[in-house]
Amino acid sequence: MTDFVIIGAGVVGGFVARALSRYNVSVLLLEKENDVAMGATRANSAIVHAGYDAKEGTLKALLNVRGSEMMEETCRELGVKYKRNGSLVVGFNDEDKAHLEELLVRGTKNGVKGLRVIDREEILKLEKNIGESVTVALHAPTGAIVCPYELCMAAVGNAMDNGADLRCGFKVTKIEKIDGGYRVWSGEEFVEGKMVINCAGVWSDEIAEMVGDTSFSVHARRGEYMLLDRECGDLVSHTVFRCPSKMGKGILVTPTVDGNILLGPTAEDIEDKTDTSTTQAGLNAIREKATEQVKGVNLGKVITSFTGLRSVGSTGDFIINSTTDGFINVAGIESPGLTSSPAIGEYVVDMLRDMGVVLEEKADYNPIRRPMHYFKELDIDGKNEVIKEHPEFAHIICRCETVSEGEILEAIRTNPKPSDIDGVKRRTRASMGRCQGGFCTPYIVELLAKELGVPYEKITKFGGESYVNVGMTKEDV
């Protein structure tokens, strides 16, 4: 029987697994999809929030500020790109200014450092392309950006390197109490764990109900985004928010750690927890709001649009508790969940200790993971040294993002291992550029088929029935 079964391999479940992998316990991470980071972690704003928005005294406030403090060192350990670019929450009138003053007071009470409300003249010194109607802003210099799915993959991979196990394609259908723990079912299969930690995102209320916990509910909030080409990368350097509302932090314009510009998200409460469609109304709202807060947004440079679903709990705060013996909820982790994720892992460990669980630290625990994009960051001499030993790094597969065969092969062989085209994309950025895989997809299919030992026709874009090949042309002629 496994010591800890964690349900949900998003960034929260990943960091809980990583935190527990430090100790002499067995950890099994379950994921219903065919890869990690497939829910909210895959599609969000990628912001490390400073911590001014969450109400004082809430878990959101506590874990936001702690997570923000931890994030830079965590990313350094995991080899994940991190950039402290600061953020601006912009206002357009006196009412907005009053709101920003409230956020300043709240953020200061939460322990956020360096917050200031600044006027238009000072805003323009920071961002020359700020919108013409912007009059005031809250400047948060500790705000930062990361790549959320890269962070999740690194956390899960580091946990696996330290002994944790991952099982994808395991959709939990039933949980039953047994002597000494729980039996967790997926159809006719099951695993057993002494304790279960529920990190199932929008599905966490349904998982909790399987053990009789109906103390909370979760609904999905749809957020749509547009991504601009790297050519637009110098549009802004800070993350530019609007004043937040009860629905979220509003439409933002932000650089990404990979050099693109991200616009969005919208905020729409929906019943269908699987609806990740984009809508004309949503994309129109992004266009209208983004061009109001930042001028020069070139909508002709949009290379893709997408939607993410946020997990909104009924309590208004993060739900991290244990209402049933041996079963822990980590639910309702909406924004600032990405920022808070390393701190949530730490918090769950402290919670377990308070529950009397003995955790003995491993002598050989290693928090360090080699950067996923280390080859890109080498200078020309460093790259040539790698190519001498491994010539596949000289063969460019994705021309838009300059991703080599060597990088793709390394990604396929590194925990957690991808099994489809989009999995390779998230790990290497191959097919993530201007042509969106128009050139490199056949080569990625070939490499995946060879490494996984399966026919081309079995390779999918994102799992399930998303096959990209139906046969070999020359054989069918």
PLM regions with names:
Residues A154, G248, V257-D258, D269-I396, ...:
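C-terminal catalytic lobe of FAD-dependent flavoproteins
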